[in-house]
């Protein structure tokens, strides 16, 4: 595997800094998926507002919040993959691109 790009490393460091500040809350794996989805929507809205009205630093901060919630969802889905294997996916990439 190649080394992550400098920008990715810097972004991940910002993600980790924010996560570390909230370690006392016990992580995200216990959070229900609907809560994570709604929280991601809220963070995206905050990012959109920041893009219009806030400083670059605030925009970057909101982008990190969005990324952290995306990572939470990714991690929760990864941990439930075995439970979800039998599910039928609608509009999968394969169906959309004619590779069924």
Region spans (language model):
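Flexible "arm" and connector segments at domain edges
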Residues: 1-100
């Amino acid at each position: 595997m190649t080394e992550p790009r400098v920008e990715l490393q810097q972004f991940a460091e910002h993600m980790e800094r924010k996560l570390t500040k909230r370690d006392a809350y016990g992580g995200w794996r216990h959070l229900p998926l609907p809560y994570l989805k709604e929280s991601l929507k809220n963070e995206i809205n905050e990012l959109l507002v920041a893009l219009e009205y806030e400083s670059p630093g605030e925009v970057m901060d909101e982008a990190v919040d969005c990324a952290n919630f995306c990572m939470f969802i990714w991690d929760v889905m990864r941990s439930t993959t075995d439970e979800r294997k039998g599910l039928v996916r609608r509009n999968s990439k394969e169906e959309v691109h004619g590779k069924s």
